[in-house]
Amino acid sequence: MFRLPIVKFFNRIFNRVTITVVLVALQVLWLLWAFWSFTAGRVWLNGALKALSILIVLYLVRKDENSAYKICWIVLIGLLPLLGGALYLAFGNKAPAKHLRERMQKVEQAHQTELAQPEGQTDALDISSRNLSRYVAKFGPYPAWRDTAAHYFSCGEEMYPQLLADLDKAEKFIFLEFFILRSGKMWDGVEQILRRKAAQGVDVRLIYDDFGSLLGLPSDFVIRMERAHIRCIPFNPVVPLVSLVMNHRDHRKIVVVDGNVAYTGGVNLADEYINAEQRFGYWKDAAIRLEGAAVWNFTVMFLNVWNAFRPQETDYTAFAPTRLPAVQDGVVQPYADSPLDEEPLAETVYLDILSQAQRYVYIYTPYLAVGCLLYTSPSPR
């Protein structure tokens, strides 16, 4: 009679999160012990490490880098002059792991032609907007589109019923890419439709961030999805090793249905995003539904990540939009940013919006983490 509670207790204690945290903590303690043991009594080594720290601080001062990032490292090195320089050499590189970077770059380079900017799409824009659009098309590279309808949802519970309705209408494919998946009302509603559509022969694919979803999904989640013919990729799986590579996460929220409808915004597939559960009080995050030509950008974004890990398509045209909306809402240009290059695309877009604003700028986000450049932006006051 005590067997089931005991099993549940052990499952809670010895889960992926607990094991990962314990193993990483043990590694950190061992590395610290090894470092201090190796340097104890070795005056020449202590001097060399301090000199290394000084050189790295000078390097950071001169480096063209985000000021907040540099200051954090300089303060850490100042507090730990022996260890700080070595830590920077080990963990200071913000670039993704080599294998991840090479995979992504290979796929993106192979499909750059899929994102060529069609002529005439931005002719109606003013000069400043056209210049910004050209910048995004060049460095994204993501083109701008007319023939697109856009609908704004001010919170997740407004978006959710429409999302379910669009998923239920899928005939060819459904692509989903999210940072957080968590079992509950929201995900259960989506999963039921995905399972039914997959059984009907619809191509259903799911990418989720393994770290973001670590606490919310069962350990056999991928197996369950694959058995239901829902192909699944956990992005950058969490491993119990001390590594900055684990910091590179997939924060995107994308849904594409038949190439004609797309969703994006800040809403993940977890109950707090539709306020079915209030973990942090009322949660207010926005979402956008697009229908028409601009959906193509989201389709390519998804397929590039998918083919980096499960190479499949060499030709994306089978996933192109087939239906244009009756009502159009100006020019729409979805874009993505990543650490694969040194171009701060998203930050530059926000800086341009702030600098060009004449009357007001509305910023709506649950997470306000403003960098130095945004604080000092020369926008009109």
Locate predicted features:
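NAD(P)-dependent dehydrogenases' Rossmann-like dinucleotide-binding region
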Residues: 364-368
